[in-house]
Amino acid sequence: MPGFIGREQHTVDDKGRLLIPARFRRKFLRQKDEESAEKAKRHEVLYVFKADDGSLELYEPAVWNEKEHQLLKLSDFNPEERLLTTMIYARLDQLELDRSGRIALSREMLDHAGIEREAVVIGANAKMIVWNPDRLTQLLADNAGSFSGLANRYVKGDGKSGVS
């Protein structure tokens, strides 16, 4: 199944609620005819991660569970691995979607992303990325000349990443 693709801007209400675009919700919300109630219930949450670039990354449970599986391999007895685990989980939250398809972002999450009234939600295949519209515009403008070089370096024509 194709991942999340597209970009939409939405208003964040006074309670910090952000509407997840309907086309993205359709990718992971319950499908009553195909899934059991228990399995569908697990799909009504999103994992929200505060990224280093000032955005918020949203993951559906199945995708986050894959990342979590990797984190479980880290040792609590290795200081660097323990630090990484702490840093990741200190930036992570699990949020339920309400009946209107919104998530309630905490003040901490909103402040991290610099979001006040408007937010841009970008579908980025396995995740969604939430940006302050002005920050996103500035990021894209500042890096406009980098696109071809980055694409050439990291995305090969054969579909394989150039990163080893």
Swiss-Prot record:
**Biological process per Gene Ontology, one example term:** negative regulation of DNA-templated transcription initiation
What domain of life?
Bacteria
Gene3D superfamilies listed in its UniProt record: Transcriptional regulator MraZ domain (3.40.1550.20)
Main location per the UniProt record? cytoplasm
The terms describing its cellular component in GO are: cytoplasm; nucleoid
The listed locations are: Cytoplasm, Nucleoid
Q: Which SUPFAM superfamilies match?
A: AbrB/MazE/MraZ-like
Molecular function per GO? DNA-binding transcription factor activity; transcription cis-regulatory region binding
Would the keyword DNA-binding be found if you checked this record's keyword annotation?
yes
Keywords for the protein's UniProt record, in alphabetical order: Cytoplasm, DNA-binding, Repeat, Transcription, Transcription regulation
InterPro entries for the chain: MraZ, MraZ_C, MraZ_dom, MraZ_N, MraZ_sf, SpoVT-AbrB_dom, SpoVT-AbrB_sf
Question: How the protein assembles, per its UniProt entry?
Answer: Forms oligomers.
Q: Which NCBIfam families match?
A: PRK00326.2-2
The family note in this entry says: Belongs to the MraZ family.
HAMAP family associated with the record? MraZ (MF_01008)
Protein name, per record = Transcriptional regulator MraZ
Could you tell me which species this protein originates from? Chlorobaculum parvum (strain DSM 263 / NCIMB 8327)
Q: What is the lineage of its organism?
A: Bacteria, Pseudomonadati, Chlorobiota, Chlorobiia, Chlorobiales
The gene designation is: mraZ
